[in-house]
Amino acid sequence: LLLAVNESTDVTWRGTVRPPIDGVSVVPRPVNGRLPIWIGTGGSAPSSARAGRLGLPVSYGIIGGAPQNFAPLAKLYRTSAERAGHRGPDIKVSVAAFGLIAPTKSEALERFYPGWRNMHTVMGTRRGWPAPDDRAYLAQAHAPGAYYVGDPDDVAARIVDLHSHLGHARHFLQMDLGGLPQDVFLESLTLLATEVKPRVERLLAAA
């Protein structure tokens, strides 16, 4: 339904979870004609294939493990898109992961840890996760783990390494897991824009 609305002002649609829509006008319309719609997934092969078949961008939410392990999913996505006849700028991949940038790796680890521990404590109680483990935190915050927590050189190098596996066009960092001081958050944003982004661009250009 969302895709139908995105394509046309007047929508006629039949589905399985709501009553039919017959010639309904949906307003207001996007300024640029169409909304950019992505399919988000935590690593489901069917979701990757579906995004490819629909010709939509795919965004992988990576919260643990080795991000490079998503490479087969990115390949499946692109293969499915090609088989469905979809090519061009809409066939792209993004990654969303935990991360925080500080002047030094040790500062980043120290600053991100309280929010991470609180999240695992609260959510773990609800979901049956094991208690927060400092060793697990450190493993995920160093390559090949899924947390992009470090200084600008470290984070940039790891983003570029992941790009060699996924070919992703965007990399989102979820920095605040709750309680992150504003000055720490703003410094991380500033370093992302002024230090990490230029490094990533230079490294990719030289590859």
Language-model region placement:
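Active-site-adjacent structural elements that line small-molecule/cofactor binding pockets in enzymes
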Residues: 1-207
